[in-house]
Amino acid sequence: MKIIIQRVKKAQVSIEGQIQGKINQGLLLLVGVGPEDQEEDLDYAVRKLVNMRIFSDAEGKMNLSVKDIEGEILSISQFTLFADTKKGNRPAFTGAAKPDMASDFYDAFNQKLAQEVPVQTGIFGADMQVELVNNGPVTIILDTKKR
């Protein structure tokens, strides 16, 4: 899995002009699933995401997790994180998991996350418009194959 983590003051995702998911303070996740991803990748990602201390404490130090601040997560599927840009000018996406596998894996990921913190999502495979107000900005890349 490859996940772009953005600390946000608020974020929302819309599909065809209708709001699909909306959060206040928390994390916006862009989630890519790879063909080799297993349940251990999912468990690792969830554990890291809910416990990662990237929110400021009273002294301004990044010392609090999304769980600590009672924040929320907006999770967006993003197969383009597996883009291969080595040849030509058009990215290839053959490094991403096949849609059926990726959809099931993404759903399982969101269900596990929701056991820890409130989660809103987009719709897998839909054309989505994402709006966010970055907080910091703080942007972190999590790759479950690099641990």
Curated annotation (Swiss-Prot):
Subcellular location per the Swiss-Prot or TrEMBL entry: Cytoplasm
Keyword Isomerase: no
Magnesium among keywords: no
One MF annotation (Gene Ontology) recorded for this entry: D-tyrosyl-tRNA(Tyr) deacylase activity
Pfam hit, one: Tyr_Deacylase
Catalyzed chemical reaction(s): glycyl-tRNA(Ala) + H2O = tRNA(Ala) + glycine + H(+); a D-aminoacyl-tRNA + H2O = a tRNA + a D-alpha-amino acid + H(+)
InterPro entries linked to this entry: Daa-tRNA_deacyls_DTD, DTD-like_sf
Keyword terms: Cytoplasm, Hydrolase, RNA-binding, tRNA-binding
One GO CC annotation: cytoplasm
Listed SUPFAM superfamilies: DTD-like (SSF69500)
Enzyme Commission number, as recorded: 3.1.1.96
Motif (Gly-cisPro motif, important for rejection of L-amino acids): 136-137
One GO-annotated biological process of the protein: D-amino acid catabolic process
Function statement: An aminoacyl-tRNA editing enzyme that deacylates mischarged D-aminoacyl-tRNAs. Also deacylates mischarged glycyl-tRNA(Ala), protecting cells against glycine mischarging by AlaRS. Acts via tRNA-based rather than protein-based catalysis; rejects L-amino acids rather than detecting D-amino acids in the active site. By recycling D-aminoacyl-tRNA to D-amino acids and free tRNA molecules, this enzyme counteracts the toxicity associated with the formation of D-aminoacyl-tRNA entities in vivo and helps enforce protein L-homochirality.
NCBIfam families (UniProt xref): D-aminoacyl-tRNA deacylase (TIGR00256)
Subunit structure: Homodimer.
Domain remarks in the Swiss-Prot or TrEMBL record: A Gly-cisPro motif from one monomer fits into the active site of the other monomer to allow specific chiral rejection of L-amino acids.
Family note: Belongs to the DTD family.
Protein name as catalogued: D-aminoacyl-tRNA deacylase
UniProt source species: Streptococcus pneumoniae (strain ATCC BAA-255 / R6)
Source species taxonomy: Bacteria, Bacillati, Bacillota, Bacilli, Lactobacillales
